[in-house]
Amino acid sequence: ITPDRFPEFYVVTVDPRSETIKFYNDNIINKYKGKIKGIFSTVSNPNTVKKARESGVEIFWFHSLVDYNEGEKSFNQISALMTRAKNHENGLPAIQTGGNVGTTSWFLGWKILNCKTIALIGINHGWEDTDSWETIMTHNGMCKMVEMDKNSESFKKLFPRIYNPDFDCYCILDPIFQYYSAGLKEFIFRSPQDIKTINATEGGCIFGDRINSMKLEEFLIRFD
């Protein structure tokens, strides 16, 4: 999957963390210099934005919606007041992020790029059976490790192991992934009927109503 096969090639950055710079400090970015467009949230890390520009990525901006509209105390309201765009006199497009770049990309595909068929690739929203409990319980080091009885009902509720019938596999969710996956599934379910969502990740917990699953190879053949 490269800009050579897909000329309208976009990448998305929504996270303000400094670690996002690594995605633009990669040989593949240099290989396709000038062929990649970037859609960035207004809260993206400035060093990441700078590196993307240096790598020849053409940048487009959007305003990320991260909480409910509660008037002047809403972060949406505060960040909107801080944002100025000389080329967008009426403001930037505002998009629900779902708290993660995968859900953001799905929304951008639908609402901004006007795609009728959206494929999910690499969006597990869960952990593999082979991942360590330390990785799962800390969300890969992002949260503090807390000792829990793994046989307790509370633990099973916080870290459920679920079966994906579409790909005949199991995955384990943590509280963060439960929030992410529930939000994305609700957005997909409530989207217009002409919007088709295909999960080509070949694993994970994204399955259910209005989600068609198939292998990536099959998707590329059927929707070439």
Model-derived regions: residue spans:
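Metal-ion/cofactor- or nucleotide/acyl-coenzyme-handling active-site neighborhoods
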Residues: 1-224
